[in-house]
A protein has these predicted regions:
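Right-handed parallel beta-helix
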Residues: 2-15, 30-44, 59-74, 90-105, ...
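Short glycine/acidic-rich loop motifs that flank beta-strands on beta-rich extracellular proteins
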Residues: 15-22, 43-49, 58, 70, ...
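Active-site beta-loop-alpha junctions enriched in small/polar residues
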Residues: 52, 88, 120-122
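Short, small-residue-enriched loops and turns at beta-alpha junctions
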Residues: 54-56
Length: 177
């Protein structure tokens, strides 16, 4: 997929029957823009961007995850993050998102293996900047070159937290039952 937009959507209570589902999963993509979404009450991670556990440059590039609000995630699974990346993605950005309130189910195999932001194997050439998280629990696992991590955590300007999620014209989605 190329040049796709996932903007101003509300994802909640997805994956109730298949706990391995994500709210947004974008595998081998380029020029995708995922912004101003709200994700809550999901069994696993909120957003997964990329695929292929390799540092080899491929079709994935120019991707953007921006100003999303992700909360109350990982209801049933661990090895998770609010935002998770995998594989080489030159000129890709994870910026100005707000991630908080992870569930802590007692039956997961490793109760400490959860993160707010997680760049997994082969994640390369990705900038992770200005994301508000309620703590500084991140994982950079077997990453490749060129990643930039700047100004993430609870000390990020509160304006970023307030602007994340649905834009004003889409807030009525929160009232749909």
């Amino acid at each position: 997929c190329t040049h796709q937009q996932i903007n101003n959507c509300y994802f909640t209570e997805v994956g109730n029957e298949d706990w391995g589902c994500l709210a947004i999963a974008a595998g081998y993509v380029s020029d995708i823009n995922i912004e101003h979404n709200e994700i809550s009450e999901v069994p696993y991670s909120g957003i997964s961007l990329g695929w292929g556990w390799t540092q080899t440059v491929n079709c994935m590039r120019n991707n953007r995850v921006h100003a999303n609000l992700i909360h109350h995630y990982a209801k049933h699974m661990y090895d998770v993050a609010g935002i998770y990346t995998l594989g080489s993605q030159p000129k890709s950005y994870v910026t100005e998102n707000c991630v908080h309130s992870i569930y802590k189910p007692g039956y997961v195999h490793d109760p400490n293996h959860w993160f707010y932001l997680y760049t997994d194997e082969g994640s390369s050439f990705i900038t992770v900047r200005d994301n508000w998280t309620e703590g500084e629990k991140y994982l950079q696992n077997a990453n490749g070159p060129g990643n930039v991590w700047e100004n993430n955590g609870p000390k990020v300007d509160s304006v970023i937290r307030e602007r994340a999620g649905l834009e004003a014209g889409y807030k009525d989605l929160l009232n749909i039952q």
